[in-house]
Curated annotation (Swiss-Prot):
Its main location: cytoplasm. SUPFAM superfamilies: Small protein B (SmpB). This is SsrA-binding protein. Belongs to the SmpB family. It holds the Pfam family SmpB.
Length: 150
């Protein structure tokens, strides 16, 4: 039995931030966490990344408790370590310290080998008027599509 592909997205990330550069990172999970992700029970809303002791961690990622788990079940919103190469970690850390960027998880997926991966992006926060402008363009595009369908 093959499960449907898991592709959990952070829709707010593209609206609130201008994504500069993306990286695919592995994530350290427990057994019940990966089972919940395979069932699609995860959320990236209000999730962000931070550095601690030279390692990249993701905070506020919600992975629901596994329904069939016992007393060994995981905490839903614990901090989880991300796995990147040293070169990528240095580049991300430099970007956050020097340029004032932030690191935002954009997507959580399971690759062809069955491993959970997180796509993180070096991002710059958008101003309120940029967000309004993006919404206006989206509405205009939608109206144009409606006009051409008729």
């Amino acid at each position: 039995m093959k499960l449907a592909p898991i592709n959990i997205k952070n829709k707010r990330a593209t609206f609130d931030y201008e994504l500069i550069d993306t990286y695919t990172a592995g994530i350290v999970l427990t057994g019940t966490e990966i089972k919940s992700i395979r069932l699609g029970k995860a959320s990236l809303v209000d999730t962000f990344c931070y550095f601690a002791k030279g390692e990249l961690w993701v905070k506020n990622m919600h992975i629901a408790e596994y329904f069939y788990g016992s007393y060994n079940n995981h905490a839903a919103r614990r901090d989880r370590k991300l796995l990147l190469s040293k070169k990528e970690l240095n580049k991300l850390e430099r970007g956050t310290k020097d340029a004032g960027f932030t690191i935002v998880p954009v997507r959580l997926f399971i690759n062809e080998r069955g491993l959970a991966k997180v796509v993180v992006a070096l991002a710059k926060g958008k101003k309120q008027y940029d967000k309004r402008e993006a919404l206006k363009e989206k509405d205009d595009r939608r109206d144009m599509d409606r006009m051409f369908k008729r």
